[in-house]
Amino acid sequence: MGLVCFPDTQDKIPSIPVHLTRVGVTGVKKLLKIEREGRRPIILLPTFDAFVDLPSKQRGIHMSRNPEAISDVLEEVVENNALELESLCAEIVNELLKKHRYARRAEVSMNSDFMFMKRSPVTRRKSQEMTKIMADAIGYRDDDGIVIRKMIGAEVVGMTVCPCAQESVREASRQKLLEFLDDETVERVLDCVSFASHNQSGRGMIMIEVPEDQTIRAEKLIDIIESSMSSPVYELLKRPDENAVVMSAHENPMFVEDCVRNMVHRIVSEYPHLPDDTIVTVRQINEESIHRHNAFAEKVATMGELRYEIEELNGAGS
């Protein structure tokens, strides 16, 4: 007995002919092993979202083709062992547009936990640290074929210390010390001690567009984000480490705005070779300890715009 030919309901004309921007699947979980020459492979458990647009004259997309496209590309990656995460998403976008001939746009996003090793600042104890890495790709059909733009990113947790509250504590301490010390001694005392403040658990995020002939490593983005807050955080800290982290953070207080500007400055310094039209998104969310709300700051710009602000404007003001 042969296979039964079922009717293709998706190809019917919808009762309400409206174009849909994104239709697809979310939360597709996969196992991905990335081989590295001379080093241990990276094992990821990424989650994929995959979408195409839908013309107004078609009732539905062929939904099974989306997870099928993800699986097909991942199998190919396992065989070749050579593909960056953002390029992986771009390949899935390309496969989606092949499978959905009626679509003019496809979009794939991926996020995964990423483990890396880090040593504590004083005792040098090694521990596994977890962070998030992301990749996106968007493809369009035009008269010349398929145009794809891809991005790589990371999100890292760190620690921030509020400068405003710290200055208030410093001034209150000054007034207290002046009750029994002279001005010069008070200033000497204030200059050699750290002052209390309220802290935040900060989450920094960077997403950078990756031009076709360029490579941006997620590990470098992790470094940039960590170094842009008051202090990194660690899974394992002994007492000397804990003291060092707290002291270091309070010697380096930052607003949420400072963190974003620090990341922007480091991105401009680290990637002078990226084209001016490269899109960059930088975001910081600080989870407050003494408020019920959180603090947020963001910068979305091209590399050319960032370079102008950092180099031209700052140079003119110096």
UniProtKB/Swiss-Prot annotation:
Enzyme Commission code(s) on record: 3.5.4.39
Cofactor field: Fe(2+)
GO terms classed as biological process: tetrahydromethanopterin biosynthetic process
GO molecular function, one term: GTP cyclohydrolase I activity
Keywords (A to Z) from UniProt: Hydrolase, Iron, Metal-binding
Protein's UniProt keywords contain DNA-binding: no
Pathway: Cofactor biosynthesis; 5,6,7,8-tetrahydromethanopterin biosynthesis
Function: Converts GTP to 7,8-dihydro-D-neopterin 2',3'-cyclic phosphate, the first intermediate in the biosynthesis of coenzyme methanopterin.
HAMAP family xrefs: GTP_cyclohydrol_A
Family, per entry: Belongs to the GTP cyclohydrolase IV family.
Protein name: GTP cyclohydrolase MptA
